[in-house]
Every structure is written in C-alpha cells, then in structure tokens.
C-alpha cells in the first residue's frame, strides 16, 4: 500500500490529516497483525503531542497510540467497536481512530517520503 502524500506522519507510526483525523499507518497495522480491539480516547479530552491516548490490541500484542498533535479529541471512530479489523483493511480510510481539534502540531511530523525512509 502506498503511503498517502496528503498526510503527515509521526515516527511512532500515527498519521494526521488536514482535518485532524488520526490513525495508524499501513506499516504499523502490518507489524501488529490482526487487530481484535481498539481502546479509544474520551471525546473532549485535551491531549499533548506525544501523549499515549489510545490502545490497539492485536492477536500478537497491544500497542499504545500517541497523539501526533496537541488539541482536543472531538470524535472517535465508533465503527471500530464492532469492526476493529478496519484498522487492518483500511488504515487510511475507515480504520481511522479519532479526530483532533488541533491546537499545535507535533514538531517532528514527517512527510510521506521521510516516513517511508525511516519506517522501512
């Protein structure tokens, strides 16, 4: 799967869209294996870039998901409660995790080329 060039990426394998949507990268979901549960943050919670805010559990492991930007959680992907496998099948579309009202982007976000270079 090609890494979308319209997104920004954290070295910890999260992506951030222009509208504040956050998910994990295709590389991350491949490393995790089959996702069986996603623990999402509470809507309204204030988060800081780099803070652990969610957990993705797979058959292999559980992995913390970090906020790629500071802001307030304004939505979570309710679809994941019944369909956590969306994180595997559509990491950049239906498998998004939460949306932020961004107050400040993380200073170390990468473009697609830089992310691909460090992820592989």
UniProtKB/Swiss-Prot annotation:
Keywords: Lipoyl. It comes from the Bacteria. Pfam families: GCV_H (PF01597). Gene3D superfamilies: 2.40.50.100. One of its GO terms (cellular component) is glycine cleavage complex. One of its GO terms (biological process) is glycine decarboxylation via glycine cleavage system. Belongs to the GcvH family. The glycine cleavage system is composed of four proteins: P, T, L and H. The glycine cleavage system catalyzes the degradation of glycine. The H protein shuttles the methylamine group of glycine from the P protein to the T protein. This is Glycine cleavage system H protein. It comes from Deinococcus deserti (strain DSM 17065 / CIP 109153 / LMG 22923 / VCD115). The gene is gcvH.
């Amino acid at each position: 799967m090609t890494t979308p060039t319209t997104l920004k990426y954290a070295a910890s394998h999260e992506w951030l869209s222009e509208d504040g949507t956050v998910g994990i990268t295709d590389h991350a979901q491949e490393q995790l294996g089959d996702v069986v549960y996603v623990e999402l943050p509470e809507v309204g919670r204030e988060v800081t870039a780099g803070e652990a805010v969610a957990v993705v559990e797979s058959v292999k492991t559980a992995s913390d998901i970090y906020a790629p930007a500071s802001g307030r959680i304004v939505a979570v992907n309710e679809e994941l409660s019944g369909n956590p496998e969306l994180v595997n099948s559509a990491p950049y579309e239906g498998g998004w995790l939460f949306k932020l009202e961004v107050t400040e982007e993380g200073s170390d976000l990468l473009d697609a080329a830089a992310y691909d270079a460090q992820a592989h």
